[in-house]
Structure formats: structure tokens, C-alpha cells
Amino acid sequence: MNAIIVTGGDIDLSLLENYIAENKEDVIISVDAAITKLEKINVTPHIMVGDFDTLSDEERLKKYENLNVEIVKHDPIKDFSDSELAVDRAVKDGIRNIVVFGALGKRFDHAFANILILQKYKKLGADITIYDRYNKIYVISNHFKLEREKLWGKYISFFSLEGKNFMDKLEGVKYPIKNRIIDNIATPSLYISNEIKDDKLEAAFSGDLLVVESRD
């Protein structure tokens, strides 16, 4: 079982609508006011999670309760964002493959926290991918292969989530790398905007890396 989490950031509604249409068996979780975006594409979620501070509409919540949507309401004063609570709910339900729409947008603090959430739950056995119109973002551990035809856009970038990682090899790309340190302080931009040149990319490295597949 997989989950689609829809949060309150910027969303390409056509991208979201197409993804939901292609993954009809997935559990859909709406976070706080993201329900207004799902309404625009006529999608009813299975679960709604949040403190609903940006959706002070009891009538709307009652409507979804009557549609047998599970409403999980949290106190606005809490130690976790609504997005993290939605991910946590999915993981506690045994879901290990999660995609998130709306995790990026105007609020960089929320966007950055959402990226860090990827690593937290990777260590708990869950694979989470953030999508927007231009980016596909996820965490990988130790080794990685990606076929060129499956790349989200033209570019692929790698970032350390541990301060430093050792890259044994990065092959099949425009800028191959062998036996180098990925260092957020010394070389923060060394691993950005690479391109797959062979049929596939292959990488071997220590620890966890954040991967960003991008298009212009």
C-alpha cells in the first residue's frame, strides 16, 4: 500500500490529478487547507490531518465526516508540523512508499523542514518522494542506479545530509566522480546540475544523500 500526501504549498494541479489517476489504489491524505486544492480536481481524500488553523470551516469538515473521511485533528500548539504528522500517520499505518505534493512553495522554513523529514523517515524504513512541477526530491542510501529515460528532468544533483559523505563512484554522467568527499562546507555546489550521459547512472557512496532531479 502506498500513500499520496497533499500539503499546503505550491501544487501543479494537473500533475497531481494525473498522478492520482495513475495510482488509484493509493491512500490519499490531505493536510490542513490542502483540501481546497483537492476539491478543484474533484478528489475526496481518505484521511484529513491537521490543526486546521488555516481551514476554520467546521461546515466543510462536517461535510467530509459525512463522506466517511477520517478527520485527524491536532492541537495548533504542537512539536510537529501538519505535514510531518501526516507522514507519521501513513508510516504508523504500515505504509512505506509515500509521495508528497505541495511540500515546497513560498515558505522556505516549511520546505526545508519537509526535506529533512525525508531523511528521518528513510531511517525508519519509509521511502518518501517530494514532487513539484520542476523537481523530484528523495533520499538514497549507499548505492544508486537510475536509467536516463526515467530521469524526471535534465539535471540530477546530490547533497550530503550528514555534513560529509564519501563518494566511491559516480558513473554514466557528464561529470563523473571517483573517490571524492561530498562536503557541505568545502564543496557545497560540487554535485549539482549533473546530467546522465550513458544509458544509466551508477553511484556508490557512504551514508544518506539527498537527490534532486530537476527540469527548467
Describe each PLM feature range.
Residues 1-64:
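N-terminal beta-strand-loop-alpha-helix module at the start
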Residues 6, 29-32, 72-73, 129-132:
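General beta-strand structural signal in soluble alpha/beta enzymes
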Residues 140-216:
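Long, charged alpha-helical interface segments
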Residues 67-75, 125-129, 154-159:
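A glycine-rich helix N-cap at a beta->alpha junction
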Residues 71-92:
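Short phosphate-binding loop-to-helix
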Residues 119-148:
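Class I SAM-dependent methyltransferase SAM-binding "motif I" and its flanking Rossmann-like core
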Residues 108-119:
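Short Gly/Thr/Asp-enriched flexible loops that form oxyanion-binding sites at enzyme active sites
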